[in-house]
Amino acid sequence: MTEKIPAWVDGELAPVGKLDVHQRGLRHKAVSVFVMRGTDVLIQQRALSKYHTPGLWANTCCTHPRWGEDAGVCAVRRLDEELGITGLAPVWKGRVEYRADVGGGLIEHEVVEIFTAQVSGSLGLDPDPSEVMATKWVDIYELAARVTRHPAEFTPWLRIYLDQHLDLIFGDLARV
């Protein structure tokens, strides 16, 4: 795994190998996308081959931008690469930061640009099996309840998003 992502080293942003970032728990840039259909959100189950949190459910797309890559461009690129989703224009909702142990001695310490995209009707999906094992649409209220009942089935960042950033991500939907 030689991909370099933007991470802070000694207070300066620098390109650092992705695995090194997680082993050292470095603060780094990330992107998360939530594709919505009304009050339903598309979630993905991470492939078993992923180097951390394999088999756990996460939001639609969660990734790291390449060094020098715009967060919005990254969101569009990874929706296509992970799920085969094209033609969406994700809307930036805000920035959050979290730190979480993701197992295996790895730490996610992310500064995350959050995006949402609304769709109506069906959405053509073509998941990359090296990234995604399964997908499903879930009502955000049911998802929050499932995460509360079965937290071990979900990634730490999805649990954090739903617990601490529901209003930022889902806005008026979270207040219904």
Predicted regions and their residues:
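Acidic, metal-coordinating catalytic segment for phosphate/diphosphate chemistry
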Residues: 1-32
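The catalytic Nudix box helix
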Residues: 43, 60-93
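Short, catalytically relevant binding-site loops at active-site mouths
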Residues: 48-50, 64, 97-100
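A structural signal for short, well-ordered beta-strand segments
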Residues: 33, 61, 92, 113-115
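Nudix hydrolase/Nudix homology domain
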Residues: 17-19, 55, 96-98, 102, ...
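A glycine-rich, hydrophobic loop/mini-helix early in the fold
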Residues: 30-61
